[in-house]
Structures are given as C-alpha cells and as structure tokens.
Swiss-Prot record:
PANTHER family for this protein: MITOCHONDRIAL 28S RIBOSOMAL PROTEIN S6 (PTHR21011), SMALL RIBOSOMAL SUBUNIT PROTEIN BS6M (PTHR21011:SF1)
Protein's recorded name: Small ribosomal subunit protein bS6
One Gene Ontology term from the biological process aspect of the record: translation
Originating organism: Protochlamydia amoebophila (strain UWE25)
CDD domains to which the protein is assigned, alphabetical: bS6
Spans traversing the lipid bilayer: none
InterPro entries: Ribosomal_bS6, Ribosomal_bS6_sf, Ribosomal_S6_plastid/chlpt, Transl_elong_EF1B/ribsomal_bS6
Gene: rpsF
Length: 114
C-alpha cells in the first residue's frame, strides 16, 4: 500500500473572545483533534493572544488568534473546512500550504519594511 503524501500547512484560527478560558481551550482542542483525526500531525502552535479584529465579524470585535503548523494529506483539508464552518466558536480561519515551520513569529514595523 502506498502512503498518502503529507503536505505542510499553516492554519490561522480566530476563536471567539466571548468564551471562557475553559471553553476556548476546548475549541482549540477541537481544531487540533480534527487535524489529527484526519491523519494530520501538529508541528507547532503559536498562541497570539486576544486581539482586536480589523472589522466586526458576526457581532465580534475581538478574538483569540492561533497559528498552527501541521502536516496532513491534501484530501483532509476540505473535510477540515467543513468542520470549521460548523464550529460556532471559530470566527475565522484560513489554511495555506507552506514550505517551512516558523519557530518564532516576528513582525516588522512599517519603517523596517521600507
């Protein structure tokens, strides 16, 4: 039997800021369990904390941001997206294919970018 190809993905998840700490951790566990349940493996998790949203989304003005690097078969991504759409605690998400895991997240100021 041939083994399915595991691609590396970067997922950004915004979880509702109205949840209790316990409920928020359960929502994050649900995301991680979904990934591993579809044959994926979590490589790195960056907790970005509570942040103001750029614009209001379904009545939410703030959310907890999580950046997750994981491997999974490409066939799992559409199944994960379906699960994410049904997760009421998840305000927004995006999943992108990437080439490397960022061990440390740093942002440049506007002056540094010019």
């Amino acid at each position: 039997m041939s083994q399915k190809v595991q691609n590396l993905y970067e997922g950004m998840y915004v979880i509702s800021a109205t949840l209790s700490d316990d409920a928020r951790h359960k929502a994050l566990d649900r995301i991680q369990t979904g990934i591993t349940g579809h044959g994926g493996e979590i490589k790195k998790l960056h907790e970005q904390g509570r942040r103001r949203l750029a614009y209001e989304i379904d009545g939410h003005r703030e959310g907890y941001y999580y950046l997750v690097y994981f491997t999974a078969p490409s066939s799992a991504i559409s199944d994960l997206w379906q699960e994410y759409h049904l997760n009421e605690d998840l305000i927004r998400f995006i999943t992108l294919r990437t080439d490397e895991v960022m061990e440390k997240i740093e942002f440049k100021t506007l002056d540094e970018q010019q």
